[in-house]
Structure formats: structure tokens, C-alpha cells
């Protein structure tokens, strides 16, 4: 009977996820995942994007109260914007809450000039993430007051859902709320190669948050949500042999499964190997010395450096390695990691 675990163990396992931050902000990151099986870049990228934009917990203003105002179709003398415009601007306030319970924060200001989110008296439990965001503009000597109710939630909710059973007091206006801390997610899929195989997927994602959480945390939370939801579909029990880590004897030295980027090589030598798509020591020892010297920018000094390192593992150039590369090389590399470290 075919082992069930071969359905997932035979797939390529990505080695790592890399995060690249942008120097101008900590709220935006480039995430690179490679290598992936062909088609998995699109599958994972689309699923992660949907979860990131819809399912993470965040905080937002859900209602406002302005003295003397009973509904959103009003205007205030001395205020440039009408209530509808003020509500639209309030929806753009980005906040972070340090408690799970709702909080009421207050804004008191006197004109003239622009009134910004940074003027709100937020207290210790609420943090304003975009203090320069303009709420309204006041005429000279005009006083303006407003109470804002903040809550924790997920996704996007309409004002009708934020009016708790139509129990809001008169004068308190429910507004639409965007709780999600993720502002934007884009992704693209490119080809990447391992050895001579060039059609593996590389997933590149760009994630930007409002500062409530870091992009790395947002990606981790989205993955955890997907993991929890997909667990429901696993309707079988793994066979006993699937649960055990197999350690059958290899037809070659486990040192061949060590990645060359883990060797203490000079930058020049490491770059030459990388540019020639030599990933594992097994890829390296199958080359002859003559093959290596034909590699661009690879000279005798680099050759001698690598020969000394290979000798420490009782290896050399020009070796005949049976069954190399194995189909499940990434799985084997992780399984035998303790053998060569």
C-alpha cells in the first residue's frame, strides 16, 4: 500500500522565508518564499492575501458623538466640513488598542486651522497611529468637541452592524469601521531554479500594515488562521510508519546533503558557487577541478580553499555519487541535519 505521507513528503519543502524591510518604514515588508512546487506560489499567495485583508484582528472607531448633532446630514457653523465629510475623515483614523474592551476617547480643539488625529486625548489604552491625519478645519475661535468610541474587531463592518441593536443613544452616530491592520497586500510569482530544474515557483509578497502589528507578525497570523481552517479537511489517521522519521541508510555520505552556503567560504567563492547553481555539497563534489576552473571568476585560490574544506569531510572533486540528486533532497537535508552539524 502506498504510504500516505508520500503525498506531502514528496513535495519540495521551502528552506526558509526571508523578510526584507524598507528603510523608510517598519510597516512595509517584502516577503520571499522559495522554492515552491510549480503552482504553489499562486495557491499560497492568493490564500494569504485574502486572509491578510479580511481576517486579522484590529481596532477602529465605530461611532462618534458631537454636541448638538443628531444625525450625519447636519453641518456645524464655523467648520468647513459637514458631518458626512467628518465621518469619512474619522474612518481614516488608524488606532491601536491595548485592551479588549471598548474605549471612548475625546477631541477638544479651538480654531483656526486643521484639526488632526494627534489632538485626540486617547489615554493609555488607545494609541493614535497616524497623528497627522486631518479630521476637519475650523474657523477662527471656533470650538469643536467630539467623542469617539473605539472597539476591537476584524475585517470591515457597516455602520448598521456597529449600532448595537439600535440601542445607541440619540446623538451618537454609528460609522463604518475598518478594523483590519493590513493596509495592502500584493504578490507575484516568478520562476526559480534548483540545479538544472528551472520551473519551481518563487513567491514574492509585499505587505503593508498601519503600524498596529508588523508585517512579519501579520503574515504569521494569516498562516496560522489558514492552518486552523484547513485542519478540518484532514479526515484520515496517519499510518504508524508515516509518523516515524525514517532513517534508512543513504547510498552516499550525509555530508553531501549539507548546503554550500553553510560552509565558511570567502565571499568570492560563495558567490561563484551560487551563480553556478551549486546548492549542496553533493552538487559540488560531482564537478571536476577542470569544471570548476571554467566557472566565471573562479580561480585556483578558490579551488584550493574548497578542496581544503572538502577534505575535512573526506570528500573531493570528481566523485561518482550514486542516485544524486535524490528526489526528496530537501526533506533528506533536514532529516540528516544533525548528522553533519
From Swiss-Prot:
Catalytic activity: RNA(n) + a ribonucleoside 5'-triphosphate = RNA(n+1) + diphosphate
Top class in the EC scheme: transferase
Keyword Nucleotidyltransferase applies: yes
Alphabetical UniProt keywords: DNA-directed RNA polymerase, Nucleotidyltransferase, Transcription, Transferase
Comment on protein domains: The N-terminal domain is essential for RNAP assembly and basal transcription, whereas the C-terminal domain is involved in interaction with transcriptional regulators and with upstream promoter elements.
Function: DNA-dependent RNA polymerase catalyzes the transcription of DNA into RNA using the four ribonucleoside triphosphates as substrates.
Quaternary structure, from the entry: Homodimer. The RNAP catalytic core consists of 2 alpha, 1 beta, 1 beta' and 1 omega subunit. When a sigma factor is associated with the core the holoenzyme is formed, which can initiate transcription.
Matching HAMAP family: RNApol_bact_RpoA
Protein name: DNA-directed RNA polymerase subunit alpha
Organism listed in the record: Rickettsia bellii (strain RML369-C)
Gene behind this protein: rpoA
Amino acid at each position: 500500500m502506498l504510504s500516505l505521507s508520500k503525498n506531502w513528503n514528496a513535495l519540495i519543502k521551502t528552506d526558509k522565508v526571508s523578510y526584507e524591510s524598507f528603510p523608510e518604514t517598519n510597516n512595509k515588508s517584502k516577503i520571499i518564499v522559495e522554492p515552491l512546487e510549480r503552482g504553489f506560489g499562486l495557491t499560497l499567495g492568493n490564500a494569504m492575501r485574502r486572509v491578510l485583508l479580511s481576517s486579522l484582528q484590529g481596532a477602529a472607531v465605530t461611532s462618534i458623538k458631537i454636541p448638538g448633532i443628531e444625525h450625519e446630514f447636519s453641518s456645524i457653523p464655523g467648520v468647513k466640513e459637514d458631518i458626512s465629510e467628518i465621518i469619512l475623515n474619522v474612518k481614516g483614523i488608524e488606532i491601536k488598542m491595548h485592551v479588549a474592551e471598548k474605549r471612548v476617547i475625546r477631541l477638544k480643539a479651538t480654531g483656526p486651522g486643521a484639526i488632526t488625529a494627534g489632538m485626540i486625548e486617547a489615554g493609555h489604552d488607545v494609541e493614535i497611529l497616524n497623528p497627522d491625519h486631518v479630521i476637519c478645519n475650523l474657523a477662527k475661535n471656533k470650538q469643536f468637541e467630539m467623542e469617539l468610541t473605539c472597539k476591537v474587531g476584524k475585517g470591515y463592518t457597516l455602520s448598521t452592524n456597529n449600532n448595537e441593536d439600535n440601542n445607541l443613544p440619540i446623538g451618537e452616530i454609528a460609522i463604518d469601521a475598518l478594523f483590519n491592520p493590513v493596509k495592502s497586500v500584493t504578490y507575484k510569482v516568478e520562476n526559480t531554479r534548483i540545479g538544472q530544474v528551472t520551473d519551481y515557483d518563487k513567491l514574492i509578497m509585499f505587505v503593508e500594515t498601519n503600524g498596529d502589528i508588523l508585517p512579519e507578525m501579520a503574515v504569521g497570523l494569516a498562516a496560522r488562521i489558514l492552518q486552523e481552517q484547513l485542519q478540518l479537511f484532514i479526515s484520515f489517521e496517519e499510518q504508524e510508519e508515516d509518523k516515524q522519521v525514517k532513517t534508512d541508510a543513504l547510498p552516499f555520505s550525509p555530508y553531501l546533503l549539507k548546503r554550500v552556503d553553510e560552509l565558511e567560504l570567502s565571499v568570492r567563492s560563495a558567490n561563484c558557487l551560487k551563480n553556478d547553481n551549486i546548492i549542496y555539497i553533493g552538487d559540488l563534489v560531482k564537478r571536476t577541478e577542470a569544471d570548476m576552473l571554467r566557472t566565471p571568476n573562479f580561480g585556483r585560490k578558490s579551488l584550493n580553499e574548497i578542496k581544503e574544506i572538502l577534505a575535512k569531510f573526506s570528500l573531493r572533486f570528481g566523485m561518482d555519487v550514486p542516485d544524486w540528486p535524490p528526489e526528496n533532497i530537501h526533506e533528506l537535508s533536514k532529516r540528516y541535519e544533525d548528522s553533519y552539524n
